[in-house]
Amino acid sequence: MTTPPGPPNAGGDARTGTDTVIVVGGEDWEQVVAAAEQAQAGERIVVNMGPQHPSTHGVLRLILEIEGETITEARCGIGYLHTGIEKNLEYRNWTQGVTFVTRMDYLSPFFNETAYCLGVEKLLGVTDAIPERVNVIRVMLMELNRISSHLVALATGGMELGAMSAMFYGFREREEILSVFEMITGLRMNHAYIRPGGLAADLPDGAVPRIRELLALLPGRLRDLENLLNENYIWKARTQGIGYLDLAGCMALGITGPVLRSTGLPHDLRRAQPYCGYEDYEFDVITDDGCDAYGRYLIRVKEMRESLKIVEQCVDRLKPGPVMIADKKLAWPADLELGPDGLGNSPAHIARIMGQSMEGLIHHFKLVTEGIRVPAGQVYTAVESPRGELGVHMVSDGGTRPYRVHYRDPSFTNLQAVAAMCEGGMVADAISAVASIDPVMGGVDR
């Protein structure tokens, strides 16, 4: 005679000391709390928040073990957005790789592209040969991108806490920046505009006046956002003292970005390890000593103002000049004056290389189909993205394709802090803690 199996959550055996795990998912919070109150001694409740939950910043899964409404254990489940970008880079030439990396952290594509291109240029040994106009445009686009990314962080964080007005304000301002990106690169996201050795094309006519209009518009709009949230009683109650992580915790976990600077440490790669000429720009590294979600909010708001200062300096420094390295053996074969798409595909350019120079046609064909050859070696480069240190470890075997490219994405590293921030707190406060980290799952899973 066989004994029929009991229900999956039938309770533990007190004689053997085993615990019963009650897994609750997709139910109302009242039912979750009621189940916790009715749980017998020795029972645990594990709640799956995500990966489809609207308050987990994308396809992030939080596995929360709770007692009542208190989190006793928190773990992250990732990998739902894995796309194999790093592996795909090994099957594309060095220039084509830009179109892949720009899609990782999709809220800060210019940082992905710049970090990749800085690594390629360092392997080639041409970092000092990059035209000044290229570096100025790169810095300008990255700082505009920093503002747009922080706006999304504040907008989505506000939405998750019930501040719908903050979401409307944030996305309204972001649209203004994305319209500038679309004017310059042709796309709102996934630009592939920054290339090894330079840029895909020069700034179009009307881009600089449009950026100046943006510089005049955004300060007032940011002031409206600050007036809405800075002294808002409910906002402060939901963020002050929430998601606490001190300097020792950040150093132990390798945390960077606004989370690290909220402990009072002024660590910013733009100052610590300048790149693209950042040492020539005047700006402040914003810090706070709250170590909580509210401090990280204040840092992001103030960093947007510093980014506006840098963009204004970039506009003043823009001088006519080339936007691609002069070495024709390394430069992507494009006549940027004739090729409006930056790829040398204009009829006038094609007619010239095909009708006047057979050698030029052969060079064009070989460089486009095979790509540039990068000397064997390995290098690590890093930039300060909106979320922290975005690093790239590149390995070249001397061929036309990368042997290995690995990204150190700050969202991936910073998610290690979820347990330290959430355990011992309330379930509702986990939303504030994760929002203050601002993870982008495209960068986490890659």
From Swiss-Prot:
Keywords: Cell membrane, Membrane, NAD, Quinone, Translocase, Transport. GO terms for cellular component: plasma membrane. It is an enzyme of class 7 (translocase). PROSITE patterns: COMPLEX1_49K. InterPro entries: NADH_Q_OxRdtase_suD, NADH_UbQ_OxRdtase_49kDa_CS, NDH1_su_D/H, NiFe-Hase_large. Its EC number is 7.1.1.-. SUPFAM superfamilies: HydB/Nqo4-like. NDH-1 is composed of 14 different subunits. Subunits NuoB, C, D, E, F, and G constitute the peripheral sector of the complex. Belongs to the complex I 49 kDa subunit family. This is NADH-quinone oxidoreductase subunit D. It comes from Mycobacterium sp. (strain KMS). The lineage of its organism: Bacteria, Bacillati, Actinomycetota, Actinomycetes, Mycobacteriales.
